[in-house]
């Protein structure tokens, strides 16, 4: 990222290691909290540097550091949080002493709170008023998805449905056709597609 020109990028999506001890080939994912946050601050500084003034930054992160990341991006780097989205997925983490985890946090951050790209018409979904009630007062163009995203398995691969407060996209499992290589945390194309359509 250091080789990119300052102010040259419209949209950045980052899915960094969550610092939960995952076995990566080239990265130690069990740093002390202070070291992890310092490392994070260094690469976010580069993200902010390369973003255009009206640029958008999306960050995917787990529970462990979600709050710290939001504060860091707002207070240290002056970004504005437009949305804090919850991505709900299948194939969650099986836990023994707490509820199973089946979500991640997606922060939609912008440099300028008044000038940024948000293509609402590109991500509209049918409303309950349209689908459930057949109400003629419903906007024929649908509505914006809520801040929790759902893509149900029965809707794959042709489309998606956003239910209240949840973005649901299944994680990319080993048998999925879109699976590339052996990376255990590959993001689904449809989730990234929604972000790209909305923000570029």
Language-model region placement:
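Core catalytic lobe of class I
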Residues: 1-200
């Amino acid at each position: 990222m250091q080789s990119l020109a300052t102010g040259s990028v419209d949209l950045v999506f980052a899915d960094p290691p969550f610092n939960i001890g995952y076995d990566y080939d080239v990265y130690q994912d069990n740093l002390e909290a202070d070291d992890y946050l310092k490392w994070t601050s260094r690469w976010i500084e580069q993200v902010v540097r390369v973003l255009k003034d009206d640029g958008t930054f999306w960050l995917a992160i787990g529970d462990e550091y979600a709050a710290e990341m939001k504060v860091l991006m707002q207070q240290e780097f002056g970004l504005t949080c437009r949305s804090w989205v919850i991505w709900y997925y299948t194939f969650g983490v099986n836990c023994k002493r707490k509820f199973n985890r089946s979500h991640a946090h997606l922060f939609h951050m912008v440099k300028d709170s008044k000038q940024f790209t948000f293509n609402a018409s590109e991500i509209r979904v049918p409303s309950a008023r349209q689908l459930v009630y057949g109400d003629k007062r419903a906007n024929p163009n649908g509505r914006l998805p809520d801040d929790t995203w759902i893509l149900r398995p029965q809707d794959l691969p042709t489309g998606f449905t956003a239910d209240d407060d949840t973005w649901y996209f299944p994680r990319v499992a080993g048998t999925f056709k879109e699976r590339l290589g052996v990376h255990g945390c590959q993001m689904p194309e449809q989730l990234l597609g929604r972000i790209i359509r909305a923000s570029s």
